[in-house]
Amino acid sequence: MMSVLVKEVIEKLRLDIVYGEPELLEKEINIADITRPGLEMTGYFDYYTPERIQLLGMKEWSYLISMPSNSRYEVLKKMFLPETPAVIVARGLVVPEEMLKAARECKIAILTSRAATSRLSGELSSYLDSRLAERTSVHGVLMDIYGMGVLIQGDSGIGKSETGLELVKRGHRLVADDRVDIFAKDEITLWGEPAEILKHLIEIRGVGIIDVMSLYGASAVKDSSQVQLAVYLENYDTHKTFDRLGNNAEELEVSGVAIPRIRIPVKTGRNISVVIEAAAMNYRAKEMGFDATRLFDERLTSLIARNEVQNA
């Protein structure tokens, strides 16, 4: 099971620590959902989920402050359980003394942020969703080409890494080589990242392992990217028919999310990196409503119709 440490959330969202011993910052977060304890403030704890991060905004804070001191303390004692990872107070609101007392007794980290509650909630949920999502490892090279995540796959030894290196030289960015960890960020979006041990590295047969960031600079690498298009490289076969018009739509499905996939035949003399660049730009054009295949079909249909009229 994937997990995130409280200290990682603090670093990512730039939270301030009001109370938190070092061991409390090592607590694991295993659930991406967060809770804004509203009814719990009134003493209703049915269906309460203490294993989530508890986020307090202006409404929760205002109600808490309106309570008598002893009632405030008792409610917070019920909320703060050993399995609670942390409590975050948004908008830079002042943490009441009763909350600090309950946190010390129950060993719960208290954190604050100056961000608005809705913004903080969105950032926190997005971060936890991506960190805790189940990963699927695939073999290939993930590149950021013109801002698009392109996954290059193919048989071993066909030249995926070499193509990736050529794309880096052409100004694009390497995300991952050899092993790409992919997860579904939501129901329609795939995201990819490198294995930590392979970050910024690319292996070229006959040369060895290359540190792309050291050789080409920080602009040549990217830590993660959305995966929008898959390209499969395969050896050219004269007995096999390859798609010439772009009508044969293929898909690659990972973690229940499908993305378009194209097959590119590889043979001597073909500049594969340029072909992949064109494929990425063509995909983006289709997303914007410009479909060259459809335009060709329309022109061909119009030409046939004119010829039929002339020959009638």
Swiss-Prot record:
Active-site positions on this chain: H139, K160, D178, R244
Catalytic activity: [HPr protein]-L-serine + ATP = [HPr protein]-O-phospho-L-serine + ADP + H(+); [HPr protein]-O-phospho-L-serine + phosphate + H(+) = [HPr protein]-L-serine + diphosphate
Assigned GO CC terms: cytosol
GO molecular function, one term: ATP binding
Binding site for ATP: G154, D155, S156, G157, I158, G159, K160, S161
Binding site for Mg(2+): S161, E203
Record carries keyword Cell inner membrane: no
Other facts noted in the record for this chain: Both phosphorylation and phosphorolysis are carried out by the same active site and suggest a common mechanism for both reactions.
Function in brief: Catalyzes the ATP- as well as the pyrophosphate-dependent phosphorylation of a specific serine residue in HPr, a phosphocarrier protein of the phosphoenolpyruvate-dependent sugar phosphotransferase system (PTS). HprK/P also catalyzes the pyrophosphate-producing, inorganic phosphate-dependent dephosphorylation (phosphorolysis) of seryl-phosphorylated HPr (P-Ser-HPr).
Protein name per the record: HPr kinase/phosphorylase
Organism: Streptococcus pneumoniae (strain ATCC BAA-255 / R6)
